[in-house]
Amino acid sequence: MAESHLLQWLLLLLPTLCGPGTAAWTTSSLACAQGPEFWCQSLEQALQCRALGHCLQEVWGHVGADDLCQECEDIVHILNKMAKEAIFQDTMRKFLEQECNVLPLKLLMPQCNQVLDDYFPLVIDYFQNQTDSNGICMHLGLCKSRQPEPEQEPGMSDPLPKPLRDPLPDPLLDKLVLPVLPGALQARPGPHTQDLSEQQFPIPLPYCWLCRALIKRIQAMIPKGALAVAVAQVCRVVPLVAGGICQCLAERYSVILLDTLLGRMLPQLVCRLVLRCSMDDSAGPRSPTGEWLPRDSECHLCMSVTTQAGNSSEQAIPQAMLQACVGSWLDREKCKQFVEQHTPQLLTLVPRGWDAHTTCQALGVCGTMSSPLQCIHSPDL
């Protein structure tokens, strides 16, 4: 994908800092306490145990800590700079207006557009000026804390390995991306606050649900894998032993960074910031199944077509993909156009034996659903 096309997706990044990501930080403290032998078995385990820097320096290759920190901060700065391009606000605004127009409850359309008018400029300005690259990279274990560690008393043993000291807050909001809430937004309620004791409506208007739903829709549209490939071009100082691993690692931890930005910053925060919403995600109506994704979206089309093709011989793949377009719920014309457009790439991807979602993710039409840590772009790894 050309960089000019990637730019428009990068410009969607900052307002989605609080989107629901897919990185699951579930490795237990007991497992991580096993030490480097466990941490460095895979990139995902190194990340979950906050030992990525250790594994890169001591186990997987020879690289200085300062180099790793600079690489990580470079990636964050690149993403941040690209997100501030002139077309950013126009691209985001048009996308959100389109989402307002396809809300399942038409009564919400005027309120949705009013929320955009009132709060869109505030949110954009805030996130463009508050990203803390060092905090994000420190969370990944690629940068050291700028504050000296407290000295340990003689005779006292540390029960946990270094990467597990100082457990991270959950969410990370206060220390990473939102170090200080802006006074103007913190002090005054917005015109669309959820406080119904002060404003009486014929029905309770679910602005907080609306806010979260819009953020989730934006986050789902960002092709993290494609962005990581572009950002990997900054890889220049990781002299690992096997050829190609440098670029692969850059792609991998670019996706990790994106997941940190998109996944660990909960949608409740932005909506609380501008609408005084509760941090309780159970409040208000739930998003409809599939978050009102159209049934014939490219991701759905791709997964249906790929599933059908995966059950066929290599010679029969083209016919099998067209046969999938006769499915009862698919838009036949859109499906055929999709097959015609992507047949060359799918003929290469389908025989690799990946599941349908991984194949469509590699094609760039589905977002990351499971682990983002597979380096699918380098067949040698």
Curated annotation (Swiss-Prot):
Compartments (UniProt record) = Secreted, Extracellular space, Surface film
Q: Which residues form the signal peptide?
A: 1-24
Give the consequence of mutating A228R. Requires 2 nucleotide substitutions
Assembly with partners or alone: Homodimer; disulfide-linked.
Query: What's in the misc comment field?
Result: Pulmonary surfactant consists of 90% lipid and 10% protein. There are 4 surfactant-associated proteins: 2 collagenous, carbohydrate-binding glycoproteins (SP-A and SP-D) and 2 small hydrophobic proteins (SP-B and SP-C).
Disease in which the protein is involved: Pulmonary surfactant metabolism dysfunction 1: A rare lung disorder due to impaired surfactant homeostasis. It is characterized by alveolar filling with floccular material that stains positive using the periodic acid-Schiff method and is derived from surfactant phospholipids and protein components. Excessive lipoproteins accumulation in the alveoli results in severe respiratory distress. Respiratory distress syndrome in premature infants: A lung disease affecting usually premature newborn infants. It is characterized by deficient gas exchange, diffuse atelectasis, high-permeability lung edema and fibrin-rich alveolar deposits called 'hyaline membranes'.
Name under which the protein is recorded: Pulmonary surfactant-associated protein B
Q: What gene does the UniProt entry assign to this protein?
A: SFTPB
